């Protein structure tokens, strides 16, 4: 099948997974002996009730498995026939894919806000790789596998006037394309400082650590990483006394939303759909001219009219609507883009916020006070030592004098 259709590794892995699940469900029954009723029984097992799956996400899984079965069984029964001329064998004949009314599997409330993205980047631990991945995912709008195939050499930094940006070459379903990076630049640089193979420009940008050091991450690994943050890291933050209550409120709402790598592309493309023409958005997203994917992303999740009315009535301004909490903090001294929460420039160490300035002044004041205290302590010790030394010397001189002279001096 690989030779006939040039399937990618991930696609082949997906087909193998579908066949494995089918075989296990039917008690490891031979594929040659499977019937149409067996296939329908497996597919019907994927159905879910309205209560458990109101957005009908199971239909996507149903159709995905069915397409894998169609391809496999056509090859199994007619492998001597040209792939384009193979007919459906009886085992998968007359089993249609299902249609879903929803344009997207996500509800409007499922999408993260820019403030929630900021909170995630701030509290996702000390793993610079994960921060970099998340920032690049929402900055580039790339598919998961496109991001994972990026190598260090694929990122080129550029400067226009006093502004810095980057371009990254990605490989997708429609071929190669160049994507600009803006808000994620500080996170990319931060991760590259700690990258285990940062000197090797051919190394994967998002590689494994510890046992899998240097290896390209899989999309399954990325999914597991996001689940780890949802199930372990962020719930603990709600009990952390050092986390401000305002941040805890945002985290509490965020934990009710999906944590997966795919929803980041939905967020990114929905945001860019507000400012890019459809033809430009297609090129940016890596969609062909006949692709129906824009129907999934271009509906703005039903809130564009609401925002327009809020703006018309003066409740919000256009500037407020486009506010981006993830915009880098540009250094006024060297123009280096820094993370939004940065207090000092990563390049020239210039102070970037009033808090940092106040901390610097306080640190200097504290340093002077410590030096002054040490000076006074040293001087007190020195005075005591000199006083003791003078006392000893006077005692020695008196001891050398004749008693009658001392008696005469004291009389």
Can you say where each PLM-predicted feature lies in the sequence?
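Short, basic (Lys/Arg/His-rich) helix/loop patches that form interaction surfaces
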Residues: 223-283, 287-291, 299, 303, ...
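N-terminal core-binding DNA-recognition domain of tyrosine recombinases/integrases
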Residues: 1-106
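Basic, Lys/Arg- and aromatic-enriched nucleic-acid-binding interface segment
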Residues: 114-144
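Active-site/catalytic core of tyrosine-dependent DNA strand-transfer enzymes
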Residues: 182-255
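Conserved tyrosine-mediated DNA breakage-rejoining catalytic core shared by Y-recombinases
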Residues: 140, 145, 149-189, 329, ...
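DNA breakage-rejoining catalytic core of tyrosine-based enzymes
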Residues: 98-118, 174-186, 199-203
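Short Cys/His-rich micro-motifs in 6-15 aa windows
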Residues: 347-362
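Catalytic-site neighborhood detector that most strongly recognizes the C-terminal catalytic loop/helix
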Residues: 285-322, 350-354
């Amino acid at each position: 099948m690989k030779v006939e259709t040039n399937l990618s590794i991930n696609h082949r892995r997906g087909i193998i997974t579908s066949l494995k699940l089918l075989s296990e469900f039917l008690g490891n029954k031979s594929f040659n002996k499977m019937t149409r009723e067996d296939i329908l029984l497996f597919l019907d097992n994927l159905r879910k009730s309205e209560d458990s799956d109101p957005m009908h996400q199971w239909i996507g899984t149903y159709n995905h498995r069915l397409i894998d079965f169609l391809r496999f069984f056509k090859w199994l029964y007619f492998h001597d026939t040209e792939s384009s001329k193979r007919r459906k064998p009886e085992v998968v004949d007359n089993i249609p894919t299902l249609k879903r009314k929803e344009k997207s599997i996500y509800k409007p409330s499922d999408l993260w806000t820019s403030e929630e993205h900021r909170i995630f980047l701030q509290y996702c631990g000390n793993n610079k790789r994960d921060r970099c991945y998340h920032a690049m995912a929402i900055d580039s709008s790339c598919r998961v596998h496109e991001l994972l195939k990026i190598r260090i050499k694929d990122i080129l930094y550029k400067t226009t006037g006093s502004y810095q940006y980057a371009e990254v070459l990605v490989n997708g379903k429609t071929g190669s394309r160049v994507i600009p990076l803006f808000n994620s630049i500080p996170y990319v640089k931060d991760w590259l400082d700690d990258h285990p193979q940062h000197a090797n420009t051919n190394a994967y940008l998002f590689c494994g650590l510890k046992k899998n050091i240097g290896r390209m991450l899989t999309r399954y690994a990325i999914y597991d990483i996001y689940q780890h943050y949802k199930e372990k890291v962020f719930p603990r933050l709600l009990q952390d006394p050092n986390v401000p209550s305002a941040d805890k409120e945002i985290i509490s709402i965020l934990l009710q939303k999906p944590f997966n790598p795919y929803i980041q592309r939905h967020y990114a493309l929905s945001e860019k759909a507000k400012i890019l023409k459809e033809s430009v958005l297609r090129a940016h997203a890596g969609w062909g001219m006949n692709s129906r994917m824009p129907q999934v992303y271009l509906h703005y999740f039903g809130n564009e009219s609401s925002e327009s009315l809020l703006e018309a009535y003066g409740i919000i301004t256009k500037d407020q609507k486009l506010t981006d909490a993830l915009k880098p903090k540009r250094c006024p001294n060297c123009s280096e883009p820094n993370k939004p929460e940065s207090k000092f420039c990563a390049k020239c160490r210039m102070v970037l916020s009033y808090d940092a300035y106040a901390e610097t002044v306080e640190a200097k004041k504290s340093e002077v006070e410590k030096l002054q205290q040490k000076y006074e302590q040293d001087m007190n010790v020195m005075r005591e030592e000199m006083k003791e030394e003078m006392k000893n010397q006077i005692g020695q001189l008196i001891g050398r004098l004749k008693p009658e002279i001392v008696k005469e001096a004291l009389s």
